[in-house]
Amino acid sequence: MENDAGEFVDLYCPRKCSASNRIIHAKDHASIQLCVAEVDPQTGRMTDSTKSYALCGAIRRMGESDDCIVRLTKKDGILAKNF
């Protein structure tokens, strides 16, 4: 939907599950969104960048959310590959 200025404005922007690419619908109250902050290895302080992961309720119901978070953070380089 566009307004008079030609900018896109939507009332609801659906999210996608980071693990399964399923669309998280509005009534999925079991879904979560995690924001993981990157940490400077020298100082141990949080930097300005974060990475967001959304998990749908179906993944959480199957008990696969912890494995999915580990897989996604390894892929993004937040966790070490040999973790």
UniProtKB/Swiss-Prot annotation:
The keyword Ribosomal protein applies. One of its GO terms (biological process) is translation. GO terms for cellular component: cytosol; ribonucleoprotein complex; ribosome; rough endoplasmic reticulum. It holds the Pfam family Ribosomal_S21e. It comes from the Eukaryota. The keyword Iron-sulfur does not apply. GO terms for molecular function: structural constituent of ribosome. It is found in: Cytoplasm, Cytosol; Cytoplasm; Rough endoplasmic reticulum. Its main location: cytoplasm. Keywords: Cytoplasm, Endoplasmic reticulum, Ribonucleoprotein, Ribosomal protein. Belongs to the eukaryotic ribosomal protein eS21 family. This is Small ribosomal subunit protein eS21. The lineage of its organism: Eukaryota, Metazoa, Ecdysozoa, Arthropoda, Hexapoda.
